[in-house]
Every structure is written in structure tokens, then in C-alpha cells.
Regions:
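Alpha-helical residues within the helix-turn-helix
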Residues: 16, 27, 61
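Residue at a beta-strand N-cap/secondary-structure junction
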Residues: 8, 19, 50-53, 64
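Short coil turns linking two alpha-helices in DNA-binding domains
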Residues: 21, 32-35, 52, 66
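Short, basic-rich loop-to-helix N-cap that marks the start of a DNA-contacting helix
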Residues: 44-61
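Recognition helix of helix-turn-helix/homeodomain-like DNA-binding domains
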Residues: 30-49
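A short, Lys/Arg-rich alpha-helix, primarily the initiator
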Residues: 1-24
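Conserved hydrophobic/aromatic packing and binding residues within compact polymer-binding modules
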Residues: 11, 25-26, 36-39, 70
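Short, charged recognition helix plus adjacent turn
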Residues: 38, 61, 68-83
Length: 83
């Protein structure tokens, strides 16, 4: 099963693979530089916050990736978490 952490880890991995910080990747995608900050991944009550589909789509378009590519990274993150 893909979790909140898998999705955020996939976004972090995409940034790393492209030699970008998460902040730089956000800027390149036309997003606020703080979009991918760890502090924004949960709300004030500790409830997990997922990135929107719009945000994920901007990342995929900027990095010329498909949703299948993103799903594969999330799936790999999921399997690594259970090992």
C-alpha cells in the first residue's frame, strides 16, 4: 500500500535524481519555494497533508515524467519501507 510518506519520499527522490533541492524543484514548477518543506507535510494537529494532484502534475510535467513513472517510484518507496 502506498502511504503519505511514500508520496513525499517520491517527491524528494525526484528532486535528488535531478540534482535539485525540493525548494528549487518547487520554484522550477512555478510553486512557492516552501511547497515541499517537511513542515508542510502535516497540519498543526499532526494530521498528514498530501500534495495535491495539481502539485504532483506540475512536478511530473517539469521533470517530463508520466504518472506511471511517479507510481513506480511510490511503489518502490512502499516496498523499501517494508523491508
Amino acid at each position: 500500500m502506498i502511504t503519505h510518506d511514500n508520496i513525499w519520499d517520491a517527491i524528494d527522490e525526484i528532486a535528488r535524481e535531478n540534482n535539485l533541492s525540493p525548494s528549487r524543484m518547487a520554484i522550477n514548477c512555478g510553486l512557492d519555494a516552501t511547497t515541499f518543506n517537511k513542515s508542510k507535510r502535516c497540519d498543526a494537529f499532526g494530521k498528514s497533508r498530501f500534495p495535491s494532484l495539481r502539485t504532483i502534475t506540475k512536478v511530473l510535467n517539469e521533470q517530463q515524467m508520466s504518472m506511471a513513472d511517479f507510481g513506480a517510484i511510490c511503489d518502490r518507496q512502499s516496498h523499501e519501507a517494508t523491508e
